[in-house]
From Swiss-Prot:
Residues 384-396, 480-500, 736-745 have a biased composition (Polar residues). It comes from Arabidopsis thaliana. It is found in: Nucleus; Cytoplasm. The lineage of its organism: Eukaryota, Viridiplantae, Streptophyta, Embryophyta, Tracheophyta. ANK repeats lie at residues 780-809, 823-853, 869-899. GO terms for molecular function: DNA binding; DNA-binding transcription factor activity; zinc ion binding. This is Squamosa promoter-binding-like protein 14.
Amino acid sequence: MDEVGAQVAAPMFIHQSLGRKRDLYYPMSNRLVQSQPQRRDEWNSKMWDWDSRRFEAKPVDVEVQEFDLTLRNRSGEERGLDLNLGSGLTAVEETTTTTQNVRPNKKVRSGSPGGNYPMCQVDNCTEDLSHAKDYHRRHKVCEVHSKATKALVGKQMQRFCQQCSRFHLLSEFDEGKRSCRRRLAGHNRRRRKTTQPEEVASGVVVPGNHDTTNNTANANMDLMALLTALACAQGKNAVKPPVGSPAVPDREQLLQILNKINALPLPMDLVSKLNNIGSLARKNMDHPTVNPQNDMNGASPSTMDLLAVLSTTLGSSSPDALAILSQGGFGNKDSEKTKLSSYENGVTTNLEKRTFGFSSVGGERSSSSNQSPSQDSDSRGQDTRSSLSLQLFTSSPEDESRPTVASSRKYYSSASSNPVEDRSPSSSPVMQELFPLQASPETMRSKNHKNSSPRTGCLPLELFGASNRGAADPNFKGFGQQSGYASSGSDYSPPSLNSDAQDRTGKIVFKLLDKDPSQLPGTLRSEIYNWLSNIPSEMESYIRPGCVVLSVYVAMSPAAWEQLEQKLLQRLGVLLQNSPSDFWRNARFIVNTGRQLASHKNGKVRCSKSWRTWNSPELISVSPVAVVAGEETSLVVRGRSLTNDGISIRCTHMGSYMAMEVTRAVCRQTIFDELNVNSFKVQNVHPGFLGRCFIEVENGFRGDSFPLIIANASICKELNRLGEEFHPKSQDMTEEQAQSSNRGPTSREEVLCFLNELGWLFQKNQTSELREQSDFSLARFKFLLVCSVERDYCALIRTLLDMLVERNLVNDELNREALDMLAEIQLLNRAVKRKSTKMVELLIHYLVNPLTLSSSRKFVFLPNITGPGGITPLHLAACTSGSDDMIDLLTNDPQEIGLSSWNTLRDATGQTPYSYAAIRNNHNYNSLVARKLADKRNKQVSLNIEHEVVDQTGLSKRLSLEMNKSSSSCASCATVALKYQRRVSGSQRLFPTPIIHSMLAVATVCVCVCVFMHAFPIVRQGSHFSWGGLDYGSI
């Protein structure tokens, strides 16, 4: 019986070990562990409501119920998360329960939270655990929440740890791991132990240990392995290694060897020196070092030199290695979470702590310099600071969160021609300092900074290739011209606007590692806004999983964007210093501004040097550029590098995002990649919605975006004509047409600026509860109104004017600032010059207060409104040929101001519209106005009906002349035009062809009748019949 008892006890002991789940059933290789699939999301975006304007996250009320139903409905979708707890332990449940006393760290909990049956401890979960497994009853967790990636426990998002058997915050878990980071660290340490205890003891050489037999052998093997790796890195692979030498170590072995080297203690004399350096450095820092002893135990100089050489050779020998490590570090199509945490258990943290006290030698480069990769690493001292495991972020003196005096002098202004020249901190740069390191009241932007703009001269309107290229000298000569000047009215063109003065919309991406939306501070928006020195005119954001990826769309001036990217490291230091909370100082995050990439960890900021070498996608256009709210449509996305592996395309709108399924376009010869998005529809919008969304394309941590306007059908029809600006058919345009269109290389940037500004206004119209400063400045309204008039966007102009009136209406009238702005841009003059009858009719009849009585209605655009030189729309139309419709519209205004002012309204030179028309021989204009005045006096209505006979010969000549003008477009068109011209010229006779055909038909009938009448027909009687013998009479 004793033997039987012994045989029974052994399986019970094994089952108890399996229940702890602290050891694997069998040894698993690193390759198998790394190839396990990992879940992408740590939190569900549908469970959080994100305010894109306030930067605030609120949990959804029914998030737990919906999440539970989703998990319960899954059938075998994530079988890799099954715990298989308690299987095979039915016979020994009592034994397992009694053995819990042996494990004091395992807390035995009561089965019920206050009821008659045990329930799950997750909030709002009423799962009955009476018939559940013993494991679930003891730990008060149901099977669904034990496998869930997150659950709401105590009003906090947590996750159940399978090794601790309790709930922890999401920040204590790595991506896809079912156990907390603390348990995994101990588990990884046990797995890295070798099978022989003496080899474990020889991993660290302790002074005074004279038993150096195994230590010397292991040290020699490690040294040989490092030399072999260095030889392979220097291209000496052809040399056959000697017999008995170790093979080339892999990455894990190199990390273990470096970890052993870093564990070596420093000599006593060097320790004393480091003590002095560390004390001096701590005096310059605002917050003391938590553990000064860790900073003193740095690596020896020889170790640092070895690490620098190894890091440099590995980086230079494999150019593609950085890209692979970078894409793996910032996410790809399989995972969006940064894998930097995989190095935390190795040598990375120790290396960063030990390199604090060393100073580099030589100059530092600016973070915005456009240099080659070889020029970026021209300093040996900078390479010495490199770390093997964090090769992507090169440590340098400018990487510190707070620049010191010694390092701040190495930042050069944009005006310096010598990159090695030392400049003192007090030297003032040429460019205006938009981002000062210390915030001061002088750097605050005034509220009316964008409301006031200087009066411009009389410049020709060339925005978006307008047809004003024939305007005269912008410095108009106006006020003293002679009456005989032939084209006095055309010399007073409306002032031009430049899109370069408008803000540029860009994106700043923050990847907050080990965070979830519940940990974001309530002052997040104000902190980012203050970090940018209160410069942005607009800010909008959204979040998505992958820790927390915060994408912030910012509208700033181009100069502000340039300075932010040039001094990104300094600006991040200001963010860490001036933040009112400890959120940024205690967080690990990565910042991407589009051209620069930087990271923060343990109080240090680093810039990526290999960021420019990545193959990033680029969006050229999205067609159509505007979609109707609530309707389904198809999109065509064009750009570069859109078909590479790892590309993801999404649509972001109002704080949420939606992944889009794309298909490759039909193969054809194009210079861009084309992707089709079928069945695209913006969710949760009503039919009259006005807004904007972004189409984003991303590869890893770098991407591009394009604005997409959401509006009604009439506005979308007008805006979709902008698609031609992104892909002009230059091969079908002649030189004269290209000059007349005036579409240079800046056309795409101007159109993007117009779409972005229009999108910001539409977004503000939907989120009117958040009014910032002046809401939307008059200068930005000016830019949108001018662009819309120059494009003949009548529906858009009416919408913009309504929004302008809504924001500037005082006592049923526009305020003085808005009236001055409208008088400055002269919308009616622009429409008259473009001969846009629909736009002129819209502006003439536009009412500020349409709901009031007719006697108190206010019209803004009057025909007699004066511009530069006293020129009015009547003067401008009178001196323009072919403007009969313009004269008719301007003299048919509701208040009849144009009709009564035709003969009396004078400009600065004393000329009236009547004299303008007479000088340009447009006498029909004067006749038209005179007839209308006569009808008004006689209270009658007269109609002018003209009968015009089109000369076929003249029409043929005009057609041939037009074909000759356009015959130089291409060879095929010239051939067709030549044939058409010959055919027309050959058919020119005395009589036109239709008349000849009619004459021939009549002649044919006459001949037939004559022949029939004069013939001698045969009669039945046989006698001849003669027409001459016939007589007439009654029958």
